[in-house]
Amino acid sequence: MSTGTLYDKVWNRHAVRELPTGETQLFVGLHLIHEVTSPQAFGMLEERDLSVAFPARTFATTDHIIPTADLERPFGDDQAETMLQVLERNTEAYDITFFDPSSGAQGIVHVVGPEQGLTQPGMTIVCGDSHTSTHGAFGTLGFGIGTSQIRDVLATQCIAMEKQDVRRIQVDGALGEGVYAKDIILKIIGELGVEGGIGYVYEYGGPAIKGLSMEGRMSICNMSVEGGARAGYVNPDLTTFEYMKGRPHAPSGAAWERAVDCWQQIQSDPDATYDDTVTFDGSAIEPMVTWGITPGQALGISEPIPDPARMDSGDRATAEKALDHMDLRPGRTMEGVNVDVAFLGSCTNARITDLREAASLLERLGRPVADDVRAMVVPGSQGVKQQAEDEGLADTFREAGFDWRGAGCSMCLGMNQDQLEGRELCASSSNRNFIGRQGSKDGRTVLMSPAMVVAAAVEGEVTDVRRLMRET
């Protein structure tokens, strides 16, 4: 087993007791909830006449079903209106802070937590959402949990978990122009597979990781679960502390100095031991795209789509299904594949630096969205939306032909009205390309970085953004 890692230190600090099942009871530092996975948990509390143990450690927002075009109440979608009303009642009844649509702070739960300063190094964080691993970018242990576990955390502020092994993922070198954090994580998942991380927590490190912004680190940790890992994290450093300082719920004054001292102590020791280590050359990574129906079916923009006939039987059936669904053939690259929709959003890539990079590229290219492409930008939070508007980014997107929307999960999972239609193919900055993920059972999704989404939007087809950059 690993020793001296951040994972070991944070785990041990939060361990309450060992259970007869072999699991460890862990105290939860922060519990984030939203409108989709929390109602049943609150219902179970009521059935057992239980209360919320630590309401000050629970924070709520609405993101999955909220409309991004019109927030006038009641919502046009009756189900969305009902789910929001239930969350309003539950948070009021149990004295839980709720970042509601009128607060100016509503947004995707994994965007709101960090920008509010709720996410802090050394915490254990849980949420009824797979991508809670996002918070690991701050040196936390972030775990997605199910409804019964949400109930348990509400009632006890604890969770039962098995300890995982730790795999160090070292990314050396420097990224080239047109290559971003999204490309790093797609490369990792493409190489290690969607089940490669089962039984592991990933620790990301190396020069390429250290050089990323906090938003970039969040993109990488966000998709750890897509590679099978239970969580992923980056050791906190000066970049982490600079991002956090001054945020609404971050420590301040003398408490800030004490907190930084504490956070530095949880970093993995220089002589920490890992259960496995995998190394990547960041300078060799090119813009990545998916060609299939899992995030693991990813390749560089210049690489040919693999031939299922050359795969082992375990991968062959999935690859054949993917090619049939995507209407692709082996041997060709993804460059030149026609795009119907361009989606810039999700808890992976809808933060302010993502929007800045995308808007900057649009200005550099000086070109509008292609005539036959439906393009939208969905900021990760109302805070991101306001900042983007203040900086003029929203105007850049609108002038180029992007639809500028309100904050929410939107087309990442198609639970509101933002959905693909029929066989549309979407160039998407989101995290999952499963069949039916974006609202249409026949819709097709190609995952890529925000810059690659912009390139696809203006060209009308999947495009190597580096070529466009060289031409301007």
Swiss-Prot record:
PROSITE patterns (UniProt xref): ACONITASE_1 (PS00450), ACONITASE_2 (PS01244)
Gene3D superfamilies from the UniProt entry: Aconitase, domain 3 (3.30.499.10)
Reactions listed under catalytic activity: (2R,3S)-3-isopropylmalate = (2S)-2-isopropylmalate
Cofactor(s) needed for function: [4Fe-4S] cluster
Keywords: 4Fe-4S, Amino-acid biosynthesis, Branched-chain amino acid biosynthesis, Iron, Iron-sulfur, Leucine biosynthesis, Lyase, Metal-binding
Leader sequence residues: none
Keyword field contains Chaperone: no
Name the record gives this protein: 3-isopropylmalate dehydratase large subunit
EC number: 4.2.1.33
GO biological process, one term: L-leucine biosynthetic process
The keyword 4Fe-4S appears for this protein: yes
Similarity annotation: Belongs to the aconitase/IPM isomerase family. LeuC type 1 subfamily.
Molecular-function GO term, any one: metal ion binding
Cofactor binding note of this UniProt entry: Binds 1 [4Fe-4S] cluster per subunit.
Pathway field: Amino-acid biosynthesis; L-leucine biosynthesis; L-leucine from 3-methyl-2-oxobutanoate: step 2/4
Major enzyme class: lyase
Assembly with partners or alone: Heterodimer of LeuC and LeuD.
Protein residues bound to [4Fe-4S] cluster: C347, C409, C412
